[in-house]
Amino acid sequence: EKIKRKRKELNMTLKDLAGSRITPGQISLVESGKSNPSMDLLEYLANDLNTTVEYLMESEETQAEKICLFYQNIAEAQILNSDLLQAEQNIDKSIYYCEKYKLEYQGARNLSLRGDIYMEQQDIASAQQFFLSANIIFIKNNSYEEIIETLLKLGKITLKMMGYQSASSYFKQAEKVFIDNQMGNDFLLGEIYYYIGYTYFKLENIENAIKYSYLAKEKFNQINSKNEYANSLLLLADGYNKKGDIKNAIKYSKVTLKVFKEINNLTYVSEIENNLGRLFYEFENMEESFIHLNKAKEIRQNTKDLKLIDTLANICENYIKLKSVSKAKEALKHILDYIEDGNNTALCKYY
C-alpha cells in the first residue's frame, strides 16, 4: 500500500517503477501484498520512490504513531499560541488514528491536550477530569515526564480552587516522581520547587516556603523569545505534511513545539520571577526581592508584556517598605512613563 501511494504521488505508472529491474506485474503483486519483496528489491524501490527502506518496512501502527505525534505537536504549539480552534481540529485528527490503531499512550496525550484547551477556556472542572483520565494511562505506561507535568497541572487547578493541602500533595508527588526517576529537566524541577514554595506560603509554613523559593530561584534562567521564527517553522511543518513528507513534517513540528515552549516559558519565567519577588517581600528579604523583580522587569520590558506594570508597582512597594521616598518616587515615575507611552490597558490596571 505504501509503495502504491508513493508511486501515485510521483505520478509513476507500474511500468515506470518497474524499469528494467522487474515486471509491472510483479510490482502489482507487491503493492497488493500478495508477494513479499526481497531486501534488494526494497532498496531498488526506495531509491526510485525517493524514500527509505525503513519507511517501506514500517508497520501501519508505527506510521500511525508518527502521524499522531505530528498532529499533537502542532496542536500543542497552537494551544501555546492561543489558536484553540485549530488545536481542537488537529487533536481530532490525532484521535482518529489513535482509535483506529488502538494507540494507548497517544490517546492519553490527546486527553491531556483536551485538558489544556479546557484550562485556556477556564473550564476548570472539565480540565481536571481530562488530566486525571490522562494520568491513569501515563502511570500505566511509566511515562514519567508526562506524569509530572500532569500532576503540576492538577496542582495548579487545585490552587485556583484554594485547596492548598491537596495542591501541596500534587506538587510533592511531582517532586517525588522527578527525584525517583532522575529526570534531567531543570526548568521542570524549578517549576515544581516554585509551586511547592508558593503552596507552603499559602499554608503559612514560612520556613519551607523560603526553602523552596530559594531552590526555585536557582533553577530559572532567562530564555530568548522567538515568536516569528516559531510561526515560520509552523508553516514549514504544515507544508511538509501536505506534501506527504511525514518524516520532515514530524521533524519540524518538534522544533516548532520546542520554540513555542520557549516562548511560553519566557512569559512564564517572568511571572514566576515577579511572584518570587513578592514572596521575598513577604519574607522581608528585600535584597532578594529586588533581584527577582528586576529580572521580571527586564523580561517584561523586552517582551512588551502588559504585566510589566505589576512588576513596576511591586518595585515601588519595596521602596515604600524600605521608607526610601526618593526611590519610590523614581519607581512611580517609571510607571507613569509606561502609561504615557499609550498603554491604556496598563492605565486602567494601574488605577
Please provide the spans of the model-predicted regions.
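Amphipathic alpha-helical segments of tetratricopeptide repeats
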Residues: 92-99, 132-142, 172-182, 214-225, ...
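TPR/Sel1-like alpha-solenoid repeat signature
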Residues: 71, 78, 90, 107-118, ...
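DNA major-groove recognition helix of helix-turn-helix/homeodomain DNA-binding modules
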Residues: 40-55
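Residue signature of alpha-solenoid helical repeat architecture, marking inter-repeat boundaries
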Residues: 65, 105, 145, 187, ...
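Short alpha-helical DNA-recognition segment
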Residues: 10-30
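A short, Lys/Arg-rich alpha-helix, primarily the initiator
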Residues: 1-9
